[in-house]
Amino acid sequence: MKISVVMATYNGGKYLREQLDTIRLQTQSVDELIICDDCSGDDTVGIAERYISEYGLQESWRVIVNEQNMGYADNFNKVTLMASGDYIFFADQDDLWLPDKVEKMVAVMEEHEDCVVLCTDYEPMYDGIDASHAPRKIMDKMPDNNLLEKITLSPGSVYIGALGCCMCVRRNFYHEISPYWFDGWAQDDRMWRLAQCAEGCYLLHSNLVRHRIHGNNTATYGKYHTVEKRVKLFTAMQNADQAMKKMLEDRGKWKESVMMEKHNRMMEHRIRLIRDRHFAGCIPLLGYLGYYQKVKSYLVEIGIAVKKK
């Protein structure tokens, strides 16, 4: 059994060394760490290379630098495809791993052979006055009680319920789902969704990551209150819906495929409402309320459309 960690970096020098310490000092050692830097303008690459040299990790840890900026999602996909481990852990450049993160997660995946993606809870760590705080409803879903939950595909489970830095994926599954990839699809959303299509998405309710939240995070809370950002989000979700639908059809899961088609149609109605002020779509959207992540979004988006000039 081989364990890989992959990290996509960009201007992450401020916190990188702390994160590398928590990976190096795991109770179950990792066999490989690949860092892929996306043309950072700071000393991220230098910090990583000096760290590897300082601890004599050249045989198992390495740094790759992109010739041109690829963007977060594509860079993460690139580095993950390079990993050779049976289990692949995603690492952000600015978090802290608890010492037994790898040991606990590998033990669960070894015990549950159907688990293709394992997620965990996390503890938020706020950095700076501009850091967005995790909503109470999110924190309430992370009881840190060490219970294992299997995520079953449903209209509500489509919406991502874990962070990429809290995920581990089987390498064979990652390569198996490569045909469903599209440019720009973030690895956390892709793993969460497609693992459910394979009936292998699990969530371990144990805080194994101290997730640093600051103004430069790729994922922040409450940031989709403009038409442009919401349309971009919904369009990406439509692309993900189509990928799920194709995977489900390839596996002969027709009932679930129909569900994803309905989810996709709902997103189209929501886009037309806020982008085109298509208020006639409010009526059919009532039939899709069960597919919303939050029902109050229905009223919020009507308000956005009303205010749009």
Task: Report residues per predicted region.
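Flexible acidic/His/Gly-enriched loops in nucleotide-sugar-dependent glycosyltransferase catalytic domains
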Residues: L57, D74, K104-V108, H112-F173
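Short aromatic/hydrophobic "clamp" motif used to bind/position activated sugar donors
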Residues: I88
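Glycine-rich, basic loop-to-helix element that forms the pyrophosphate-binding segment
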Residues: V65-A83
